[in-house]
């Protein structure tokens, strides 16, 4: 059963906050529990085991810290939709709340931590251990799957993960990109419109995709070597 952040003792909350920052910065395996406890200002070296049972329990608590706020915003977007929503509207309902309800500093911490979770399997990912908190996300995913009845569910979920990855990376890169000397993204709105459209574009790819990597393997060989390609414009070897 999931547990809200405010239900933890004060010391446990300090550990959760420190863990989000340190896991995001160093990775789930790049920082020791002892270092986290020290960073949280706690003196008991067994504090993680005391409050969370294990490292996995701590990761779960970090994930659940911001989940209720983000999920409530997702539910509000779902409530405002009609029954004929587009994939763009569904993706927006899933991603936009992150930048709408979390201040810049907190959403950067959130994004860095969430990026560390992306490689985890379903059995390891904390999302699947707190589905009672994540009903809006589950509903959004269900509707996304319904939009692509001819695609296998694993293909759709892979594309969703790629879209989420793009958006989270956009949060991580915002400060750097907005400071580029070209000033290509003069306003925050322009930047986020761009990031969102990049994320959305993964759903427009055909399946099966056009062959590229497999096509190279099947090219005819001359004397045991593949023929060199020439640049059409200059004739130079590529």
Put a short name on every predicted segment.
Residues 75-110:
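Hydrophobic alpha-helical connector segments
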Residues 14, 89, 93, 109-116, ...:
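Amphipathic alpha-helical interaction segments
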Residues 44, 56, 118-123, 167-172, ...:
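Short alpha-helix boundary/capping elements
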């Amino acid at each position: 059963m999931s547990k809200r952040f405010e239900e933890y003792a004060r010391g446990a909350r300090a550990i959760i906050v420190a863990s989000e920052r340190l896991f995001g910065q160093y990775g789930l395996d790049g920082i020791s529990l002892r270092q986290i406890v020290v960073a949280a200002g706690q003196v008991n070296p067994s504090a993680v085991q005391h409050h969370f049972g294990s490292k996995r329990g701590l990761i779960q608590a970090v994930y659940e810290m911001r989940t209720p706020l983000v999920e409530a915003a997702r539910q509000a977007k779902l409530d405002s939709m009609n029954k004929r929503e587009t994939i763009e509207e569904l993706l927006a309902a899933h991603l936009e709340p992150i930048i709408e309800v979390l201040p810049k500093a907190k959403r950067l911490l959130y994004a860095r931590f969430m990026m560390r979770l992306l490689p985890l399997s379903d059995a390891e990912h904390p999302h699947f251990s707190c589905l009672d908190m994540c009903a809006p996300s589950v509903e959004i995913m269900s509707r996304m799957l319904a939009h692509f009845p001819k695609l296998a569910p694993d293909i759709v979920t892979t594309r969703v993960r790629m879209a989420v990855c793009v958006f989270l990376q956009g949060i991580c890169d915002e400060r750097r990109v907005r400071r580029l000397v070209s000033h290509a993204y003069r306003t925050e709105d322009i930047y986020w419109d761009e990031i969102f459209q990049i994320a959305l574009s993964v759903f427009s790819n055909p399946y099966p995709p056009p062959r590229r990597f497999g096509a190279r393997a099947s090219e005819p060989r001359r004397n045991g070597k593949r023929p060199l390609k020439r640049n059409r414009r200059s004739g130079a070897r590529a």
